[in-house]
Amino acid sequence: MEDRQNDQNDDVFSFFSPSFSAATPSTLFNRSAYSSSSSSGDDESQPSVDDSNKRIDYMIQFLDRRLSEDGNHDGIGDGNGSDSLPEFVGKCGESGIFKVPIRSAVHPNRPPSLDVRPHPLRETQIGRFLRTMTSTERQLWTGGEDGALRVWEFSELYGSGRGLEVEDTAPYKESLGNEFGSAAVVCMIGDEGSRVVWSGHRDGRIRCWRLRGDHGIEEALSWQAHRGPVLSIAISAYGDIWSGSEGGALKVWPWDGALGKSLSLKMEERHMAALAVERSYIDPRNMVSANGFANTLTSDVTFLVSDHTRARVWSASPLTFAIWDARTRDLIKVFNIDGQLENRPENSVYPDFGSEEEGKMKVTASKKEKAQSSLGFFQRSRNAIMGAADAVRRAATKGGFCDDSRKTEAIVISVDGMIWTGSSNGILMRWDGNGNCLQEFAYESSGILCMFTFCSRLWVGYSNGTVQVWDLEGKLLGGWVAHSGPVIKMAIGAGYLFTLANHGGIRGWNVTSPGPLDNVLRAELAGKEFLYSRIENLKILAGTWNVGEGRASTDSLVSWLGCAATGVEIVVVGLQEVEMGAGVLAMSAAKETVGLEGSPLGQWWLDMIGKTLDEGSSFVRVGSRQLAGLLICVWVRHDLKPHVGDVDAAAVPCGFGRAIGNKGAVGVRLRMYDRVLCFVNCHFAAHLEAVNRRNADFDHVYRTMTFSRQSSSLNAGVAGASFGVTMPRGGNALGVNTIEARPELSEADMVIFLGDFNYRLDDITYDETRDFISQRCFDWLREKDQLHTEMEAGNVFQGMREAIIRFPPTYKFERHQAGLAGYDSGEKKRIPAWCDRILYRDNKKHLGAECSLDCPVVSSISQYDACMEVTDSDHKPVRCVFSVKIARVDESVRRQEYGNIINSNKKIKVLLGELSKVPETIVSTNNIILQNQDSTILRITNKSEKNIAFFKIICEGQSKIEEDGQAHDHRARGSFGFPQWLEVSPGTGTIKPNQIAEVSVHLEDFPTVEEFVDGVAQNSWCEDTRDKEVILVLVVHGRFSTETRKHRIRVRHCPRGGPAKNHFNDGTKTSGQINALHRSDYHQLSNTLDVVEQLKNLHSP
């Protein structure tokens, strides 16, 4: 983990990185349909003139740097210019936690990424962070805290953002947010059948969205679904929408009811339709309340996933799971995270079936019983009370409180019908479709926040920003740090796995990664660095002063900072001993325990320094932190503020018991031009002989300083609170790869330490020191400096740099006594010393390194001195001016270059051609006729010799067959769901090479249709008895490819007792085409009716 980076290379570390080149070859999505060059508009198909001019500017700058290199390697300094001061460099900075973090144009320890939305500054996202994401065939959709939706067309992924919300983001369309009272988007799901996206919101509403070309995003339908927030949403194999909320609330919105009809209405007609949809839901809990399960279904429904393999729906809370039949909405099983069945009431009349039987059982009542089981007010109240009592009972049984580290945080279903759940302790669990836990895996102790499956792979996103890739057998294929923050959502499209980070950044990763494509793409992209990188130049003024509990005059502040701030872009000020005393220290410790910071005296200092810097006109304060007598603050120029953000603060006490703030450090971290800069103000142990304690103080600060958002009134409004994701550390589990995390300071591109380090002069007397000072023989004095001695030995400030000191020692003076005669002349006659220092570390691995994406932050020192004329304290203030070069990436140009490589590179084209193959498959029939609860076997043969085929069966729509035998009134179904009278099992699956898969196509007798109002069945009527026809589509994928082979199978439903028409509506001869395999060819399994009869017999006399 020693190469963790910030977001350009983005806080990347080599968590788990097998050789990409040695990975198994895989199939990539066909991107030709999505490349930016396929767009019809000229603005979309060609890079803009501005982008071309940028490339020219970057190339010229690159050539200028190369031409000037020859003259920059002389002298003691680091080669950043003739005005740079020579520097002293500490030892032992080449390894361990003091090693410079790895940076490069394309990081070597992770696959190249497509930055769809580069990491935005947190301060620009307050109240509008992206929180969820889904994809359709041609778009990537996201939802935010403000209720707004953003949509990226896959055809524009490589395009320029042209000054949108985030400058370097890919082009996108956006809906309106809070302007129209919309609440935060909590969950989303794409519906390919209806070509819409459904979203659940914090205000309890479900909304339906369409993309209308140039008109942007249109809200097609909206209704109040729940009283509380819509926490989860799923679409079943039958096209019904399932939604979950707080307190176990679960509702089903049938596609065959008002929902499906409403989408075909005109906009002005949809208001009344929304009212009908709102009342058309089914509450599946009402249908099972009598059997004893409902009392366990009281936890928030945080997850809903549709099992298309078995036509089921899984609902989940953090600790329990429930499995439902997607067609009948009957409850099948309830169990907890240990796989144990939830207890039913002791007086339950129902038997306790074994785990195998549980997989087949469907606890239900007959349709007649359902209609009669409408619950009145008292019955529902009784159930609520019983549910609460049962929850208390179960909590008491389990010890009252659950282990938060075991909570379920993500759940997905893979194409082979296996269910995968991830918990907050990093444990990944594999379940079969009947709810039996098969295996547990753990390779990472950080919490799992999201997962995604497609064909043969499973992707897992963690709270530490890591993404792992697994196969469906549980084998770990690779992993890397995808973002600098938690990965909260995933989606797939256009050949990429898209990951959404908690900070709002979106990246696309090749679905074959780790794979052979990565090395080619990495080399090509790195070779074009000069086209998309540029150098920014700025100056930083850092000042430190131990103020000795005093207050400075305006003249002193102007002398120290006012003049030096001219021409600098960033000012960092660290103060020590702002206030001391036992009472102050005790109060500070008490405040820290409750999250309070700052003091009136600290605020006075900030205001006075702000006035000196002309705060408000020239500078703006971006961050500060106070711990007892330690205070640090950072100001930046107004014109630089748009490029500065993600400001965090930290404090580390080093006083008594590492708990009191009389000694310690405070720090501020910020991100500028996508690089991380840290500023740390320290006050270490005093006294001449306490060298080891000072070294230990530094080591403690360096290793333990952890930054967090600021809450202090000293920085009000700078970094407000927002919807966040915690990053649980989780205990180690068996098999977890445990690698010691690098300190946060180790990951910064530049760290500046300033403060009263308290290092003194050794082996010299007071009088000798005064003589050397009067003669300005600082070279002799530096040989006695404890800090340089310890740095030379590699004991402290390892690998850090300091300009050669050419000013008198800054401690200790008599207050208000000018000149060098002011040194302590009292009884103690403390030996003068350079206690007040400023040191730094940038990205340079060696002296003379040039600024580039491999070494993105390079600094030198142009001024390092003390203000000897200031007499307000027993210490003199010290200041240092840094000349900093920062290499930054133009993500818009880089994204275009990425697209050019993908679409034109010959090696990549050859790889794609070899890898993007779909196995050849054949089906046993193209036409099926069903009647009288018929069942037919559809056989699918994989003719490939070596490649696995992945299939899914969908329904394109349903038609009515008229007397002439022709299909009419074709209607699409939501999410390509099956009609209620048809059961297809399995709906998804895998077929090994040269193997055959059998799919059961079964006619379910469904003579009546019920109308539900407010969750209760109200009316029923006979179903239309005319013949029906559906078009089933068998969609076959290769291992990774969305390029597909499709087979269409016509399935005709004839009413019971009616004649079977032997002609189809395609106008072709059908004799010899119909190949309906009858029930004798099908092994009949027990069904719902069998279980119902068994249950009814239990009550028979």
UniProtKB/Swiss-Prot annotation:
Thermal behaviour (record text): Optimum temperature is 22 degrees Celsius with Ins(1,4,5)P3 as substrate, and 22-37 degrees Celsius with PtdIns(4,5)P2 and PtdIns(3,4,5)P3 as substrates.
CDD domains on file: INPP5c
Tissue-level expression: Predominantly expressed in interfascicular fibers and vascular bundles. Expressed in seedlings, stems, roots and flowers. Expressed at lower level in mature leaves.
Crosslink position(s): Glycyl lysine isopeptide (Lys-Gly) (interchain with G-Cter in ubiquitin): K907
Keyword Magnesium in record: yes
InterPro entries linked: Beta-prop_IP5PC_F, Endo/exonu/phosph_ase_sf, Ig-like_IP5PC_F, IP5, IPPc, WD40/YVTN_repeat-like_dom_sf, WD40_rpt
Main enzyme class: hydrolase
Coiled-coil portions: none
WD repeats: 121-162, 180-219, 225-263, 403-432, 433-481, 483-519
Annotated region described as Catalytic 2, given as residue ranges: 828-843
Keywords: Hydrolase, Isopeptide bond, Magnesium, Metal-binding, Repeat, Ubl conjugation, WD repeat
Cofactor: Mg(2+)
Biased composition (Low complexity): 31-40
Assigned protein family: Belongs to the inositol polyphosphate 5-phosphatase family.
PANTHER family found in the cross-reference section: INOSITOL 5-PHOSPHATASE (PTHR11200), TYPE II INOSITOL 1,4,5-TRISPHOSPHATE 5-PHOSPHATASE (PTHR11200:SF300)
Role of this protein: Has phosphatase activity toward PtdIns(4,5)P2, PtdIns(3,4,5)P3 and Ins(1,4,5)P3. Has a higher substrate affinity toward PtdIns(4,5)P2. Required for secondary wall synthesis and actin organization in fiber cells.
Protein name: Type II inositol polyphosphate 5-phosphatase 15
Lineage, top ranks: Eukaryota, Viridiplantae, Streptophyta, Embryophyta, Tracheophyta
